[in-house]
């Protein structure tokens, strides 16, 4: 793992969290219980404080940063998709930020909301509970349905379960030179499938 103290502030990581060895945590970063931090994520707390609350996930290649005297927060059970950028914003409890979305300074994403992939949420945006946001700039297009929220929660549970799986079975290795016969497939822990 790449942890760096900055001007006397050391990242805080709960012992039940999983931080991938290629992720980088710098300075004023607080990671809660059962959190998953994916490969190549960068949590750069060299200005503002970064807080990832219990059960949330920050997936591969995500960036968190913010200005001085601000907190960038991912609420409990928050779900931050691959490549998303969070800068000085607040992601509400049980919300999802889709892949490669950008959430700017002072923006607040409401609880149980979903930000569609590739969306751009402008600085100062104030979302409400259970909104589906999409576009550039993002706007609320409708409410999140019960089925969509259930789907989001299944995906988040997969990452919460992945924390324990990684603690138990992830290790560095050398590659095989050819694929073995009857190579098994990995299985998730829920029946979640991609949204179509």
Curated annotation (Swiss-Prot):
Stretches for region Disordered: 173-196
UniProt entry tagged with the keyword rRNA-binding: no
SUPFAM superfamilies linked: Trimeric LpxA-like enzymes
Any GO MF annotation of the entry: transferase activity
Pfam families in the record: Hexapep
Keyword terms of this UniProt record: Repeat, Transferase
Gene Ontology BP, a term: carnitine metabolic process
Biased composition range(s): Polar residues: 187-196
Keyword Repeat among record annotations: yes
N-terminal signal peptide: none
Pathway: Amine and polyamine metabolism; carnitine metabolism
Entry function: Overproduction of CaiE stimulates the activity of CaiB and CaiD.
Family from the record: Belongs to the transferase hexapeptide repeat family.
Protein name as catalogued: Carnitine operon protein CaiE
Organism: Escherichia coli O1:K1 / APEC
Lineage of origin: Bacteria, Pseudomonadati, Pseudomonadota, Gammaproteobacteria, Enterobacterales
This protein's encoding gene: caiE
